[in-house]
Amino acid sequence: MQRGIQGYTIPQGTGNERYGTFVPHPLPPDPAIVWSNQLRNKFDQAILALGRLDSMAMLLPDTTLFLYTYVRKEAVLSSMIEGTQSSLTDLLLFELDEVPGVPLDDVREVSNYVAAMERGIMRIRDGFPISLRLIREIHAMLLKQGRGADQTPGEFRRSQNWIGGTRPGNAIYVPPPANLVLDCMGDLEKFINDIPEQTPVLLKAALVHVQFETIHPFLDGNGRLGRLLITLILLQQGFLHQPLLYLSLYFKTHRNRYYELLTLVRTEGRWEEWLDFFAEAVIITATQAVEAAQQLLELLEQDRLRINQLQRIRLSCLHVHRALSERPISNARWLVERTGLTSMTVNKALVQLQALGIVQPHTAQKRNRTYAYTDYIAVLNRGTELPPPA
């Protein structure tokens, strides 16, 4: 359904530098969403896919084995959409104080995203509502260091921003003027918290993401925070108990269509097309997450069986193997801290695991060498490959 423009334009500028800022109408869309049989079926499938993902998470023998890397995979993917050149391996190396293979600012951005996501999840689990205060708190974590640290972290913008182009006058899109950001975000806060009426959770997450991107309330970090809001809404409303859904994988793969639909919603009110795209993203991503978890569980079990065939230091190898399943790129120092084993025992276990082909050295130095659980990382890395150099 084409509703026409979903807001109004305020003329700005003087002389030859004239442009219009776009102010969106508050949610929900008006006229209301038209639920065709196809769209309703797509949303039903998405809800079922989320249910399967959540059930799988509840049945995992140890969710912590997956959470550490799944959260970081989403951080890498979401940051890639914004042009950051950091792989999952780069992030894991950075967290070990090792030198990654890309500029440090790129990895810091991804590391900030992890910290922001973990802060948001902690607040949600502590019973905090998704409020403007929480959104600003998460944003402060997102831009706490590296690029963007000078873009007023944790504060709504007080100046005009724009998307595309070199200035508002030649931009692709110019969000609301700074003096209306708080009003727009206040309306969005009410909608998130079901004021004045309740909205189905998955529909809410889909609508809120577009509205947040349209308002663009911060000078930097809007895309990453807008995608993070999807996860937080699903967690807060009980649709997911663990943050194992990484929609950024689908958005990255279909990046052009993603941005096209954000524009079509604003300019023509084509919400149904966005909702179809969003539901498809949930179905595919949730299904892939379940499959990846199953593959990782099978890999862990197969490798444990191989380790159990060892005649010497079998138990020590099992302890180190379990620690590597938490952090599949680790060094001896971290493994000693995590397992409580001596440095000598950890190094002997790593030699045995390398002989079995389970781990490979990732760095050449002899002291505190970094090791990679290669097959485990290969499963996680699907979809996070860096684009080829231009």
Question: What is each model feature region?
Answer:
Residues 1-390:
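FIC/Doc superfamily catalytic core
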